[in-house]
Amino acid sequence: MRFYRSIKSMYNFGVNVFIILFIFSCSEKSKNNKEDFEILEGLRNQSLELSGKELSEMYCGACHLNPPPSLLDKNTWKTSVLPDMRRRMGLITEDDFGVAFGADADAPPGVYATQSYIKQKDWDLIEAYYLDQAPENLPAIPKDPDLDSDNSDLFKISVPENPNKRANLTTLLKWHKKEGLLYLGDRANRLFRFSGSDLKVLDSIKISSPPSDIRFRMGGGFDLLTMGVMDPSNYSLGKYSIFEAFSQEAFVVKKDSLTRPVHFAFADLNQDNEEDVILSNFGHHVGNFSWLENSPTGFQANLINNRPGARKSIVSDINNDGLSDLIVLMTQAKEGVYAYINQDNGKFKEENWLSFHPVFGSSDFDFVDVDADGYRDIVLVNGDNADLSPILKPYHGLRIFLNDGDYSFKESYFYPIHGATALLVEDFDQNGNPDVAVISYFPDTNNQPLQNFLFFRQMDKMTFKTFSFPELGNWSYLTMEKGDINGDGKMDIILGGFDFKTLYAKTPGNWVPFVVLENKIAIE
């Protein structure tokens, strides 16, 4: 018996070492779907007898962080997430009859395997493990007894009056400080300008598709990024254009065939004294994070990260070597915050600063010194719920990861918010401590009034007082911008309305594309 136990102990030790080495190799090597499948093929040829938990660590960990069963309820695992994962590994069963996947679901080759990379018996063990360990329901977010709805001393809500009958489908907001105008784009392929003084429409132009980002040029005109297709899609119809003036005739498309781009940034990445463009091509099953080299022959694409889900990037010289480095939020599968350290001449070294599980739902971030220690921290919201698991998740919310000075980040603040979508970090009360504004596009609809906007006022170092705004009613907000709208020296907030109900309404109501929160905080 002692000999048997020794042999079993040695076997278990070998299995554990194999799992550790395998997971490490996955995190180091897997850069795209092809490499994921190569890893899975190596797994399929193994004959180790593993438990469902051990198998999940290996198979699920091949493509992303291994999600524990506690992240989703039993029914969501059973009916949605697990079947899709099985199909991606090429294991097709009779349950898939009539289900669109692979090419039938607009997925290009390489997303869903064309051969099985997992044995049925191994899959059965993984499925049984998840369904046995998953809760029937996820825990609810407890009510915050300190949440304050008395916001009268903070912001005055202004709803612009607009007689136009148009759906509220705002995709872009940007305040032009010099012009004193608000630029607004919507899903109906139009770009508007609003007066900052009375919030009235001045003019508009037709554009090729829904806009996602804009940058005003020093000498006039602007750069514009359009998505091509706003809904989840692998079509490469997005465009980067330069407008010399606010006219639908005065523009040049500098780069087309972009895969659902949602954000751009600008910097000279290869030290040729030309401004290059950093693109977050969010995509769907496919996409990438890349940069366009501004060369004499046009803008040449250079790949940085070949995975979909790039949401937003920030340019910063992280190591103080005079070169522009990049920080990007990746929000699909291998979710996380990645830094790309410029190695000169446009080459980058990847650093994974933060990693999240694949149902985390990262949606927005900023890189700013929150605790006034001289080091820039990561402020992040997660709440994307337009996926395979559209249930209320108690781990959605606002997080602050403090920088220890060596770019090692520790979560130091968390406030749960269902469906947190976007954030603004700004010292709105000018007390020296940055505050945070958060919108939620996927709030708990059973919790009335909706918590679709929350304001976190930093009273002291990392001490926040949270305010709700019941007056904002049941509107849905997808975008947010800041700017001194009324010229009083204080930053105001603009919320961009996006509500499909207004698109399909039998009788269209008045157009309410945005709401202004006028800053009324007394400056001491």
Regions found by a protein language model. Name each.
Residues 24-25:
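C-terminal motif of bacterial Sec signal peptides marking the signal peptidase cleavage site
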